[in-house]
Amino acid sequence: MAGIVIGAIVGSVVSEAVGAVVADAVLGMVIESGITAAAADVLGASLATASFIGGATGLVAGGVASLAVQSVIGSNGPSSAQSAVAAAQAQGILLNSQSNVDPIPVIYGRRRVGGTRVLIEVSGASNEYLHIVVVLAEGPVAAIDNVYLDDLLATDAKFAGLVTVNKHLGTASESADSDLISAVPKWTTECKLANCAYVYVKLKYDSNAFSGLPTITADVRGRTLYDPCDGQTRYSNNAALAVRDYLTNPLYGRGISAANLDDVSFIAAASACDARITSPAFSDTFTADAASDTLTFAQALPIDTGDGIKVSTVATLPTPLTATTTYYAIKSTDTAYQLATSAANAFAGIAVDITSAGVGTHTLTQADYAAYTCDGTVDTNQTAYDNIRALLTACRGMLIFSGGKYRLVLDIATTASSFGFTESNITGSWVISQAGKRVKYNRVTAGFYNPAKKWQPDLAMIESTLLRATDNALILEAKIDLPFTANSYRAQNIGQLTLNQSRYGLVVKFSAFQEGLRCEVGDVVPITHSTPGWSAKLFRILQIEIKDNDEVYVVAREYNASIYTQAVLAPAAVIAESNLPDPFSVPTVTGLTLASGTAELLRLADGSVISRIRVGWTAPSDIYAQKGQIEVQSRIANESAWSP
């Protein structure tokens, strides 16, 4: 069937002579066929816009409406959609803003976010209580896990007795927070914030705990996703299911009817996303707590919920863990995890009941991880076109509108079609183009957000010294944005595939009889022809267009299954946080002694005598505190005010 592509496969290369450039690691692909005005508008692009973006000629020539053109739309550079979405996320996703018009993000998978303050009020006899309401995301979300004040857990001992957090998941039936109604009269029962996931944070003034208004962030498990495989809706970060959710949601997505989706393709894509990839052998030691079923580590780990792990020990493992079993991680905090017996249980939060801490030193080793996940925020201020392309980067996806339905196909190793092009169905002349160095890479740098580094932007770089030598030592680099990838291994894998695919840039353009409509964009087909000397050489279809003479125009790119072989990656490097002391954490003065007697009296020149109290304390062991100042305050008995 025919269609319009509004994106591109990772690393696709089509010569400028072909009329469509798919280059420099454009990552998302949306393909539409059977184009009508309604089908085009559903993604926020008119036919005229799609024609311009795709660089496709004769898009609607000849009045073809029910079966139009398939075309790869890309850019001569990194995807502008990726860059726009990534830039929007980088600007303030971990900050707090204050506005009544800010767009509310949609969270897929797990993400740490800031939010928009919609209320700041004080209460108490001396205004000692501060009340803050921060909207985090479009609701409902699966869970709001940890809340942080200036990157410190709200449950930290530093905030004991000073911080109260109420979490609201943002259901449609959400009620106004009763505690906030009691504390702040202007917050009434009508202030429900329905469909908004938010936190209400109450702070009690303490100059030692707070140096100013803290930045409030939270770890959020985002949207629950419908899975057409079993008809269930549950929390998941499966990239294919996230794309499906965005397409069908009428509030923040495109509101496409489920009847217009080819769920067989979405099920296949979701299964491909869940495929397990053997991970580098990252390991670290842990202690187990039977009371909380938790494994605790000394540092943040590059391990996410759903990752497969194994455990070992020098003595006795915590009961009932065994060394031969693959468990699945449930991430509680950056340094604390629980274990589940399956990936499904991990996402459902069903943890293994640990009944003993074991004996000796225990080690956790990462075993595997899902091929593609979607962990990030959708900026609802961006166009649906840009957001869909950005979502597709998480799974190297192609969204195709064909036969009246949208289908999702991943750019993965694909079995060749039984149908092929030969001299019997290829007509007329054709063009063969080889991509130049502008779209060939020997280095790819992928930008992503790293949970192991408090969700700060990070880079994963893949480089081939062999290819660089082939390229006369020139650095041929592509920079790509992966706004919905939150794992260094996945970012490296996508970067490696981008690099590999760029080296197979041979593109063929030809006309064929209508028999060519037996294949679709995304299919891998063999081409046999004596002119170039090809015998069942494999190509992936990038474009199909019906011509005025009832022939079809085909553009295909060289296909090689070897590019999908997973590279051997090094274990992620864990960078320890600074061990400098917290400048806002002041050690408690100990060993306080008070003495008042004849030795402490002060006799003035006029003969008068002033009574004094000598104060003593144990010198602090902290060298930073030793070089600081200690302030002594006193008050008269039965009075409340202290003075220096």
Can you annotate each of these PLM segments?
Residues 521-601:
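Acidic, low-complexity/disordered segments
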Residues 280-367, 550-578:
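Small/polar beta-strand repeat architecture
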Residues 629-644:
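Recognizes extended acidic, P/S/T-rich segments that occur
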Residues 77-126, 135, 186-191, 371-377, ...:
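Surface-exposed, non-catalytic interaction/assembly patches
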Residues 139, 149-152, 303-332, 516-551:
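Ser/Thr/Gly-rich low-complexity blocks that favor extended beta-strand/coil architectures
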Residues 367-403, 468-558:
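An acidic/polar, Gly/Ser/Thr-rich interaction patch typically located in mid-to-C-terminal regions
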Residues 603-626:
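Conserved aromatic anchor
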Residues 2-6, 10, 18, 22, ...:
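Polar, S/T/G-rich
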